[in-house]
Amino acid sequence: MSQTDGRITMAINQKLTNIIEGRVVKSCREGASEVQIRFQDGSTMMVKVMESNSPPLREGSQVRRVHENGTELMIDSEDGTTLSLQLIEPGNSISVRDKDGAAEYLG
């Protein structure tokens, strides 16, 4: 994490960004320990969380990039909204599966 112009910036998770960039959110549901994001292409992202610090991503928003630093995960969308989450276990809290259930990302 670095600080620029008074704002804290986090490293981009390039692998995850490359997988979900451009996908359009169909729904975003936040539970007590898990956030589920369904995309219009039928894929699903599950994130095990300690807490969510922001409102869910809006239906129809398009993913721009994903930032990660330790337990912090931020998903930016093209409409300017950001989903900010605290991961339960870095490296073992995120899964993305395609419409057939095949793993695209585990980390």
Annotate each PLM feature.
Residues 2-107:
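Surface-exposed, interaction-prone regions used to assemble/regulate multi-protein complexes
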